[in-house]
Amino acid sequence: NIRLTPFEINQICLTFRQFFHPEDHIWLFGSRADILKKGGDIDLYIETHYQDADQVIQARLGFLVALKAAIGDQKIDIVIKFKDQESLIHQIAKQEGVQLI
């Protein structure tokens, strides 16, 4: 169980599909991915097939603006993995998060 409404989940998924590749994936992680925790911003982890940093930045910004318009002005953090970069936050987000797409 996660601490987002069905509407918020649906809007995250619909908005994500507008800005990222069909093969890309998104996870919710952090406190909102744990039903026992309280508060917290919406932490999203994305794995994308975009290879160009400018494309990643444009997709991220478009996604963030459209998502805030859809669900309201909430604190949303987005971590994106592209190319072959792998960091600890990527591993934690994927292991402890809940895949939405």
Segments predicted by a language model, with ranges:
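Catalytic core of pol beta-like nucleotidyltransferases
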Residues: N1-W27, A33-G39, T48-I101
